[in-house]
């Protein structure tokens, strides 16, 4: 696939499927090393379309359960001087329970876990074709910030996973 960056399609407003802000409450977090690249299917004509995200044998995704719109995701362009521009992915999450399992997961994240986040947006497009987005697929997301305070946000643990600077 060429890296020429030639615009090939119109950017139109789909009045039958207007965008809606937000993501669904359940997020899948996957250890990047648990993804089976040989069984994962990327559309040969569209490198942004993954039709099958496969995990290695006996590996599973971790569910981060949210409520309302406390979790969010974003992407921002990172201009590169000597290579093609990249996208920095950011997932902002909230751990609603501070039990041992949650603390263990956050500790594992802080020890350098490389993660992939699969989110389902509220804006799904025609026939749900645009419902899912995969963040950190190529380079993984790492824990960037984590904050807990008994005096803020109902005592929940706020954290951010993002592409590592320079490794988008």
Q: In which residue ranges do the predicted regions lie?
A:
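Structured, beta-strand-rich domain cores
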Residues: 67-135
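Mixed-charge, glycine-accented linear interaction segment located at domain edges/termini
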Residues: 134-168
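Generic structural motif
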Residues: 18, 30-35, 96-100, 122-124, ...
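Solvent-exposed edge beta-strands and adjacent loop segments
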Residues: 2-90, 139-151
